[in-house]
Amino acid sequence: MGHAAGASAQIAPVVGIIANPISARDIRRVIANANSLQLADRVNIVLRLLAALASCGVERVLMMPDREGLRVMLARHLARRQGPDSGLPAVDYLDMPVTARVDDTLRAARCMADAGVAAIIVLGGDGTHRAVVRECGAVPIAGLSTGTNNAYPEMREPTIIGLATGLYATGRIPPAQALASNKRLDIVIRDGNGGFRRDIALVDAVISHEHFIGARALWKTDTLAAVYVSFADPEAIGLSSIAGLLEPVGRREEGGLAIELAAPGEGEFDLCAPIAPGLMCTVPVAGWQRLEHGRPHRVRQRSGIVALDGERELAFGPDDEVTVTLHDHAFRSIDVAACMRHAGRHHLMRSLPQPAAVG
């Protein structure tokens, strides 16, 4: 459908939407001065996406089901036959169990890729986008930030994201102009028996001295041992901001950054960074170096926790070996800015005036 599997554009492409109904509700919102996105706000975002997709000729959207009320509230709007909510694409929901855990996002991304969607629009923070990328394969994603940490998804009006995605999905912008390559961090933990565990991060992998996962969100900087980033934006919020304010690395630039942290008073210098909205923390920096594509970097810490894109995920012990490897060109995303420039330069949103109705 659309550009899926490299095929030429078809008449009725399908776009997937994965909206995390509970993003931006973790402990970082409690300890910092940050708001949570309400359910009605999420519904309004989806409606704006649908309106933009409809204007591009997308007639069908596939969504992840939920049990938080988003589906019910959205259905009320879609049932209207008049007004701004009329004429929107048909919304179908995946036939899948709902657990209200990250498993839903993983399963939905996998099902949408299997269904041949042209693209997947993701509403969530870094953790939600990471889960989608794990399972979406070659399907490009369009990120929309609705989480606490939003270093990966850029801040944009949903209508514009919907337009860019719709123009690509319907074949009006070719992949060479519409898509961008993104970096990824691969984390591998090998044990003494030859077994291994593997996971990914889109933005940052952080090593903590802690030994229990507990609350998944990581925000206490005095427990940090090392920070690895695929890119580092000095305007970002979250653990990647440490790298962004130390040595910025562009998201399209090759390579990443590895930072070793020290105990208080023992680093080369202290760095103040915004770890969560409204939460400024100081971290002692011991040293840093660039990460090169495809070259594994061995973690020095003997035991602890690996947090991926801000959330504790993996525990390791003294008999384990942990490596972090950066990969350039790991997955594709909709380049919204490039799509909109292409649309303007090639007059994609123009049409001839329709004759006025007589009588």
Curated annotation (Swiss-Prot):
Keyword annotations: Acetoin catabolism, Cell membrane, Membrane
A GO cellular-component term linked to this record: plasma membrane
Cited Pfam families: NAD_kinase
Pathway(s): Ketone degradation; acetoin degradation
Keyword Membrane: yes
GO molecular function, one term: ATP binding
InterPro entries, sorted: AcoX-like (IPR039065), AcoX_kinase (IPR011391), ATP-NAD_kinase_N (IPR017438), NAD/diacylglycerol_kinase_sf (IPR016064), NADK (IPR002504)
Main localization of the protein described in the UniProt heading: membrane
Subcellular location: Cell membrane
GO terms under biological process: acetoin catabolic process; NADP biosynthetic process
KW Cell membrane (keyword) present: yes
Known function: Essential for acetoin catabolism.
Record protein name field: Acetoin catabolism protein X
Organism: Cupriavidus necator (strain ATCC 17699 / DSM 428 / KCTC 22496 / NCIMB 10442 / H16 / Stanier 337)
